[in-house]
Amino acid sequence: MTTASPSQVRQNYHQDAEAAINRQINLELYASYVYLSMSCYFDRDDVALKNFAKYFLHQSHEEREHAEKLMKLQNQRGGRIFLQDIKKPDRDDWESGLNAMECALHLEKSVNQSLLELHKLATDKNDPHLCDFIETYYLSEQVKSIKELGDHVTNLRKMGAPEAGMAEYLFDKHTLGHGDES
């Protein structure tokens, strides 16, 4: 591996922040990969919950966009992007919509915690630009995602999922499908 040439635009950008951004990029890509796995699982012919598949595919795209936004920031600040291997999802069989939503909730909380730690690092290193970036583009969105997933988990449980097979079908159709006829 060759060493990156020094940046002429770098200013008030600590090496620890640069390294943390690279770790966050990896975590966002991992989240995208997990959501893609979930989407493909629900699209299988023996699962056939198309709106769960669409929902998780949308989440996958969103997480990839988060990673790309961080990459753009890294370049704007004069940092260097060092991509690492993306860890494989912990499972291939997501078992049920409820289980997948619970895993997604846990994942979003992990991503949020990592962002909070990145924000603390930026604060400690006196980097107001990075603090503003995280606050503007990530923190509110994370809280909304966590709330939405928590609501989905609650509603699936109230409906009797996963024991009541009809519950996930109805949730797929009326909540994730917004009542679509198909």
Curated annotation (Swiss-Prot):
Q: What is this protein called?
A: Ferritin heavy chain
Q: Give the GO terms filed under biological process for this record.
A: immune response; intracellular iron ion homeostasis; iron ion transport; negative regulation of cell population proliferation; negative regulation of ferroptosis
Q: Does the keyword Metal-binding apply?
A: yes
Phenotype upon knockout is: Homozygous mutant embryos die in utero between 3.5 and 9.5 dpc. Heterozygous animals are healthy and fertile and do not present any apparent abnormalities. They show slightly elevated tissue light chain ferritin content and 7- to 10-fold more light chain ferritin in the serum than normal mice, but their serum iron remains unchanged.
| Phylogenetic classification of the source organism | Eukaryota, Metazoa, Chordata, Craniata, Vertebrata
Q: Which residues bind Fe cation 1?
A: 28, 63, 66
- Catalytic reaction list: 4 Fe(2+) + O2 + 4 H(+) = 4 Fe(3+) + 2 H2O
Question: Assembly state and interactors?
Answer: Oligomer of 24 subunits. There are two types of subunits: L (light) chain and H (heavy) chain. The major chain can be light or heavy, depending on the species and tissue type. The functional molecule forms a roughly spherical shell with a diameter of 12 nm and contains a central cavity into which the insoluble mineral iron core is deposited. Interacts with NCOA4; NCOA4 promotes targeting of the iron-binding ferritin complex to autolysosomes following starvation or iron depletion.
Where N-acetylthreonine occurs, the residues are: 2
Instruction: Show the GO cellular component annotation of the record.
Output: autolysosome; autophagosome; cytosol; endocytic vesicle lumen; extracellular region; membrane; mitochondrion
Q: Name one GO molecular function term.
A: ferroxidase activity
- Gene (name only): Fth1
Task: State the source organism's domain of life.
Answer: Eukaryota
**Which residue numbers delimit the Ferritin-like diiron domain?**
11-160
Q: What is its main location?
A: cytoplasm
